[in-house]
């Protein structure tokens, strides 16, 4: 009985207009269940981008802030949902090492070359007779045993260190690099790379204000969609590099301290990287990195009965 009296007194003493934690939680739950009602009431929608590709049922999209480069104070303009299979994978450092070493060596060519005893000038005459002198027997002064002679088992360049990693390993390396950058708060998503001015000093001061570090890699969808202001600003800065989305690689992400992506770039990366998980195994070598469909037969005719692709 005493408990009921105390509960009634607390309810009577509560000021008008105040809400308990339970009621606030119920309102937040109703807002998440009915986002259309929240939008109809005039409240801004915080999520600017939704994941277009299907997400596994046991996982949820990862959220990141969407920022803007148009001002120092416009640091956060909304949220973006990121696919967990691209931006929240297991941090496989061994995969990062494999892909980084592959990028370092697959274009490496060593031009080191030494001459054998047949290529060294001279040495055609036997230095002394085989017997009778008491010296060790030799047949040429250009033997590898002699000073100035040829080299045995030396490098015979040019030597190529080319090898190819499986495409799915390379795609996994990009996923791991994006995941690590996001986990370390070194990945920033922008609504656009548009700057109010093309002065490089503005970009350096903005990066210093937001604590991006000394080196920044900015990625846009294509060269044609890059704003002229960001092109002018990065062209005069050595540590700020601007590349298209198709050129994003593990080496560049590890080399730069901060990675900046646009919303169209995020959609492009999710589409291309998740396609590697579900594509069929090719029976022919790829002609392009992202074209897996065979080309039409040269003798195929136009019409419904024509076979457009190889079987």
Curated annotation (Swiss-Prot):
Region annotation (Disordered) ranges: 118-149
GO biological process: mitochondrial translation
Signal sequence residues: none
Presence of the UniProt keyword Flavoprotein in the record: no
Subcellular location: Mitochondrion
Gene Ontology CC: mitochondrial inner membrane; mitochondrial large ribosomal subunit; mitochondrion
A molecular-function term among this protein's GO annotations: RNA binding
Omega-N-methylarginine modified-residue sites: 147
Regions that span the bilayer: none
Keywords: Methylation, Mitochondrion, Ribonucleoprotein, Ribosomal protein
Family: Belongs to the universal ribosomal protein uL4 family.
Assembly: Component of the mitochondrial large ribosomal subunit (mt-LSU). Mature mammalian 55S mitochondrial ribosomes consist of a small (28S) and a large (39S) subunit. The 28S small subunit contains a 12S ribosomal RNA (12S mt-rRNA) and 30 different proteins. The 39S large subunit contains a 16S rRNA (16S mt-rRNA), a copy of mitochondrial valine transfer RNA (mt-tRNA(Val)), which plays an integral structural role, and 52 different proteins. Interacts with MIEF1 upstream open reading frame protein.
The protein's name in its UniProt record: Large ribosomal subunit protein uL4m
Organism per entry: Homo sapiens (Human)
Gene: MRPL4
């Amino acid at each position: 009985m005493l408990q009921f009296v105390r509960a009634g007194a607390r309810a009577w003493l509560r000021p008008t207009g105040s809400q308990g934690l339970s009621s606030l939680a119920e309102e937040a739950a109703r807002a998440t269940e009915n986002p259309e009602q929240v939008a109809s009431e005039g409240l801004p929608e915080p999520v600017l981008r939704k994941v277009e590709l299907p997400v596994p049922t046991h996982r949820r999209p990862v959220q990141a802030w969407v920022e803007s480069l148009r001002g120092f104070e416009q640091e956060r303009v909304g949220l973006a949902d990121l696919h967990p299979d691209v931006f929240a994978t297991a941090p496989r450092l061994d995969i990062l090492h494999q892909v980084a070493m592959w990028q370092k060596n697959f274009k490496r060519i060593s031009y080191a070359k030494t001459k054998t005893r047949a290529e060294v000038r001279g040495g055609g005459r036997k230095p002394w007779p085989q017997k009778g002198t008491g010296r060790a027997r030799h047949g040429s002064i250009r033997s590898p045993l002699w000073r100035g002679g040829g080299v045995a088992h030396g490098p015979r360049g040019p030597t190529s260190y080319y090898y190819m990693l499986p495409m799915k390993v390379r795609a996994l390396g990009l996923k791991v690099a994006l995941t690590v950058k996001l986990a370390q708060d070194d990945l920033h998503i922008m609504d656009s790379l548009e700057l109010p001015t093309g002065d490089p000093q503005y970009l350096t001061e903005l990066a210093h204000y937001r604590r991006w570090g000394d080196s920044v890699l900015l990625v846009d969808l294509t060269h044609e969609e890059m704003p002229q202001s960001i092109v002018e600003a990065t062209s005069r800065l050595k540590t700020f590099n601007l590349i298209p989305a198709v050129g994003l690689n593990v080496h560049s992400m590890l080399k730069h301290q901060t990675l900046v992506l646009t919303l169209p770039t995020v959609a492009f990366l999710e589409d291309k990287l998740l396609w590697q998980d579900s594509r069929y195994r090719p029976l022919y070598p790829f002609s392009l990195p992202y074209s897996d469909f065979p080309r039409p037969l040269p003798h195929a005719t136009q019409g419904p009965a024509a076979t457009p692709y190889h079987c």
